[in-house]
Amino acid sequence: MAARLTAVIALGVAFVSASPAYSNTTSSAYLCNPAHSYPSGVSCDATARTLITPAPSSPSSAYFCNPAHSYPGGVSCDATARTLITPAPSASSSAYLCNPAHSYPDNVTCDATARTLITPAPSASSSVYLCNPAHSYPGNVTCDATARTLVTPTLSSSSAYLCNPAHSYPGGVSCDATARTLFTPAPSPVTLTEVVTSFTTFCPSPTTLVAGNKTYTVTKPTTLTITDCPGGCTLTRTAVPSPVTLTEIVTSFTTFCPSPTTLTAGGKTYTVTKATTLTITDCPGGCTLTKAIVPSPVTVTEVVKSFTTFCPAPTTLTAGGKTYTITKPTTLTFTECPGGCTLTKTAIPVAYTTTEAVSTFTTYCPQPTTITVDKQTITVTAATTLSVPVTQTLTKPVLPVTSAPSASASSRAYLCNPAHSYPGGVSCDATARTLIYPSTKDAVTGAALITTIVPAVPAQTGVASGNCAPVYVTITIKEIQTVTVGLGSPVYFTSSSQAPSVSVDTPVYITGSSYFHNTSAPAPTTNANATSSAYLCNPAHSYPGGVSCDATARTLIYPSTSTASFSSISGIPGGCNPAHPGSCPSSYFDTTIPAQATASATKATRRGSKMVRA
């Protein structure tokens, strides 16, 4: 019995983009911090991380200094006493003389006669990393003049969520030094490539356009539709990934308002006059919350032949079987990595979205309400789970995953991605991350579904005797899915009851039967379709059966097809394989191969265990 129906082969594409890890590769132990402020007009270069000192007008006074800083006017810092060493000023200069009426930090006093600062000897416990009371620090942080340590004020409700410009944040997020709030850079655009049989484009000015091996000349602004794409036309477009959000309906929630604002929830408006943590419990019908999905960091491991790293402090480092001793801040380059050096980096994946059409929208209504779905207004009278047929589209997040370990060629248990779609009704178990194959009782085998798919192109004419140029045709398999195969290419089934109706002159072979004209002709020993499948693959995934993914073209690379050797068939030295179009002359088949064949060719029928052309 033969039946037909059509299902859809989905195209799964995943993108991976990661933000670089924070590191200093050119800094030294005394680099300045752009988030700090420095006295005497000194600032910090945000790129070079070095202090920029304004032109001096006269020498500086001798408050506790930092040997890591530079000072104007030839002034230097004594590393032991932590006092400034000032060159003798000119007789006419008095700009840096101290004032006995002023007070100075760290118990420094002003000599009323000489008008110079008198600095007490530093304690034995002081070090070059103690803070400086003469400096100012962000976030109301102060320096204890006695202990020389930073004192951080207790955060109030209005400042508990302020960020720190001196800190680094994942995912490319940075801290605004003025507002002390986090801001996220716009996502980087990604390039998407697809192969189509026709497309429409707008040309705003005169130009020439090449598509499907033809050149089109446009002389004025025109909307152009291209339908002639033999072999498919490749389109490339740029897209910006959308922020990934999650929407949920809750009966109560808590939120923090950092500044005065108004908030509407559950049909009520709340006025906030100051920084407040607000708890909303009155949500008749449910309050809708939208949250951003923050991807977790992933660890990426790679093996390299050489690498460069920065060591900010004395340490020991082992690489390539050798141990290196670092005695000071150093940028180190390794070129000796016999067998490769393994580097481990942490990165934040960028989230992208994929849109899918759904036929049913399901939601839970905790109490009586009305809901509008796909232009339908539904009245709910009691708490219920509601399922509504829809034609709208929903958007779900697709987060990249780390690469899975390779599995043996005979194993189907390599890790899959639940966000991807797979051909032939195959799905991915979200918990076990393994592929779930449909029952072979009512469908062709998963292997047959995968290996017989080839890129769909418009039907072409041309099957020359002895040189079988494939004519791509569409067949319907057991009401499961539609695949496209070349004229003369085999389509395998597990039993004769699964043989489909074939709309063109394409032989259908039954597994285990004598499906060649000559019974001595051996079957292929591996996959009969050695070309790649039409859906894009992921180089980070592993595939069974020795199949790999081309990192550039994103297409599957199948191992070469091999055919059992034999001496001759029907007197043909070296033999031929009818599963390979062009390898057998027309005399090999039951009937002569027509010189031309199109999509309207005669219908194939099955007789016994062999296919013949009607």
From Swiss-Prot:
Q: Which GO terms describe its cellular component?
A: fungal-type cell wall
Q: Keywords on this record? A: Glycoprotein, Signal
Q: Where is the signal peptide?
A: 1-18
Q: Which InterPro entries match?
A: Sed1/Spi1
At which residues is glycosylation annotated? N24, N107, N140, N213, N518, N529
A single Gene Ontology biological process assigned to it is: fungal-type cell wall organization
Which molecular function GO terms apply here?
Answer: structural constituent of cell wall
Protein family (similarity comment): Belongs to the SED1 family.
The protein's job, in short, is: Probable self-resistance protein; part of the gene cluster that mediates the biosynthesis of enfumafungin, a glycosylated fernene-type triterpenoid with potent antifungal activity, mediated by its interaction with beta-1,3-glucan synthase and the fungal cell wall. Does not encode any steps in enfumafungin biosynthesis, but because it is related to a fungal cell wall structural proteins, it might play a role in self-resistance toward enfumafungin.
| Protein's name in the database | Probable self-resistance protein efuJ
Q: Which organism is it from?
A: Hormonema carpetanum
Recorded name of the encoding gene: efuJ
